[in-house]
Amino acid sequence: MSLAVPEKPSLDGLEAKWSALWESNGTYRFDRSKSRSEIYSIDTPPPTVSGSLHIGHVFSYTHTDVIARFRRMRGAEVFYPIGWDDNGVPTERRVENYFGVRCDPHLPAEEGFEAPPEPPSRPLAISRPDFVSLCERLTASDEQAFEDLWRRVGLSVDWSLSYSTIATRARQASQRAFCAC
């Protein structure tokens, strides 16, 4: 094995190597066995997954990540999940614009419904179940794009705790919180 420093070092593959190592070692995985006094919890509002990513997304989450890393260096067990806000009006608008459709709750579901390959000039009225299906399909794609970005940036979140606000579990938790008021 040569210890000589190369004339031109290569960074190819370093990012993937370290990301894979951190993931396999559970470097940022939250340890639920820690006592409450040892835990530092970060609750960030999940980014709205309804469009294009921009530098503002990276800028705002970098601040939080710096705090998470600082707390870990100080010995805290950091609870830092990541979520996606993909439930509500922004998602509906994104689906309407992306597919050229609008929800008509009076229409019956169409068996084997497929979205138009290109958005029509006038919005196509579709049933609520078909509309919800398109919402779930598009948000899954958008969530993956967001996750790819955050992983590439190297956010130190616990990926095993990721959630989405459109998921049944998150909706039920939200409803329980509102009902408890």
Region roles according to the model:
Residues 1-181:
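N-terminal, positively charged nucleic-acid-binding surface of large information/translation enzymes
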